[in-house]
Amino acid sequence: MTVKVRKGDTVLVIAGKDKGAKGKVIAAYPRQDKVLVEGVNRVKKHTRISTTQRGAKTGGIVTQEAPIHVSNVMVLDSDGKPTRVGYRIDDNGQKVRIARSTGKDLSS
């Protein structure tokens, strides 16, 4: 499955516990078909407490984002509406992403 969502896109979560949430894509993992969305799918991770060189202790319970499957998000177009993503070849022969609903370019 090709991942049409890229880093920097604004997406809407359409399924799961964070349904309806909007956020910016921090990272995309095409081999796993997952994306990391800012402020979505926050989990608590328990990390071992360790001492740094200066004597400060780091660790404990850390809250961070976890990847979400790409099928659970939709890209938002320039109007802020969810849309499917398509491709078109422009005049220069470059492949550009377009919003299927409006036909506008999705320049990110």
Curated annotation (Swiss-Prot):
Keywords: Ribonucleoprotein, Ribosomal protein, RNA-binding, rRNA-binding. Pfam families: KOW (PF00467), ribosomal_L24 (PF17136). InterPro entries: KOW, Rib_uL2_dom2, Ribosomal_uL24, Ribosomal_uL24_CS, Ribosomal_uL24_KOW, Translation_prot_SH3-like_sf. One of its GO terms (cellular component) is ribosome. CDD domains: KOW_RPL26. This is Large ribosomal subunit protein uL24. NCBIfam families: rplX_bact. The gene is rplX. HAMAP family: Ribosomal_uL24_B. GO terms for molecular function: rRNA binding; structural constituent of ribosome. GO terms for biological process: translation. One of two assembly initiator proteins, it binds directly to the 5'-end of the 23S rRNA, where it nucleates assembly of the 50S subunit. One of the proteins that surrounds the polypeptide exit tunnel on the outside of the subunit. Part of the 50S ribosomal subunit.
